[in-house]
Amino acid sequence: MVKDTKPLAYAANNGYQQKGSSFDFDPSAPPPFKIAEIRASIPKHCWVKNPWRSLSYVLRDVLVIAALVAAAIHFDNWLLWLIYCPIQGTMFWALFVLGHDCGHGSFSDSPLLNSLVGHILHSSILVPYHGWRISHRTHHQNHGHIEKDESWVPLTEKIYKNLDSMTRLIRFTVPFPLFVYPIYLFSRSPGKEGSHFNPYSNLFPPSERKGIAISTLCWATMFSLLIYLSFITSPLLVLKLYGIPYWIFVMWLDFVTYLHHHGHHQKLPWYRGKEWSYLRGGLTTVDRDYGWIYNIHHDIGTHVIHHLFPQIPHYHLVEATQAAKPVLGDYYREPERSAPLPFHLIKYLIQSMRQDHFVSDTGDVVYYQTDSLLLHSQRD
């Protein structure tokens, strides 16, 4: 039933192990550099946050969104709607990334400005700002840790085998996993409990309950506004202007976040216990190239340096990554260059969903394993 994907043995030779007369790189080997060395390689100006520059990106995105809405309402034909929905959904995703930067504090040095802008941006696309910010902080603090990570965490073999066959098939068959984000906000992932909307959820410490309540209220206000607009205009108009673009945004979010932490062709280790460290966990992330979309969604594809140093503003991430690559060496996985649109990544998503099903219940360094029965059912 199970095809085991075994990791290479640990290497003491800067991440390499000898096999015959050649050396193979072992991505799970402790790196020969410290995080301070990576930090020192990044130019000082890359750490500087410019709130006016950050706000200019907000203005850019809001103006594009407003122009798209105005054009769609003015021309109102089905051909334009077919163009409008994916473009507007992509712009919703761009807003999410800017709100994400507010949550990290990379938007500005002002907590008040970060919170204000973050609430406006995230509430407008039905994301509870503080609830998501805090769970995402947990994700960054524990990236690559099987038991403590928060985003797209591998299922252990025990949890996987307790899923019924239909749940397994849906979870690992594209496009179904690309629609799970709203479910995650309400109930988290299999094996975890809690809601991003509940101030008393075990996701949050008591000191942050007030912020969670405020964000949930903002979310509810936006949701109520959409219902009100449906009554005074028409449900179909709100569906076309907002509903379908919202689901395009959700697909972008799940697509991007999954691929930054998975890649069957790249053999990414996951850790437990004493083998995990902040640096080793961060090095399991993957950069991706999105072609023309790269700038639209604010350089989120430069994910390795972002995960190690989330306080770096997005507009400095490309330069910071280039500066750090000589230190990272083979621990940095060079992304495949994209055509104008990143259709090549769909192949990687499908391959990973077909191969990366669960990890062992034991072991401090583990890799994804494949359920051969599920693999065959996906191909049938």
UniProtKB/Swiss-Prot annotation:
UniProt KW keywords: Endoplasmic reticulum, Fatty acid biosynthesis, Fatty acid metabolism, Lipid biosynthesis, Lipid metabolism, Membrane, Oxidoreductase, Transmembrane, Transmembrane helix
GO cellular component labels: endoplasmic reticulum membrane
One Gene Ontology molecular-function label: oxidoreductase activity, acting on paired donors, with oxidation of a pair of donors resulting in the reduction of molecular oxygen to two molecules of water
Protein's membrane topology: Multi-pass membrane protein
Gene symbol of the encoding locus: FAD3
UniProt free text on domains: The histidine box domains may contain the active site and/or be involved in metal ion binding.
Family of the protein in this entry: Belongs to the fatty acid desaturase type 1 family.
Pfam families to which the protein is assigned, alphabetical: DUF3474, FA_desaturase
Enzyme class of the recorded protein, top EC level: oxidoreductase
Position of sequence motif Histidine box-3: 303-307
UniProt protein name: Omega-3 fatty acid desaturase, endoplasmic reticulum
Pathway: Lipid metabolism; polyunsaturated fatty acid biosynthesis
Annotated localization: Endoplasmic reticulum membrane
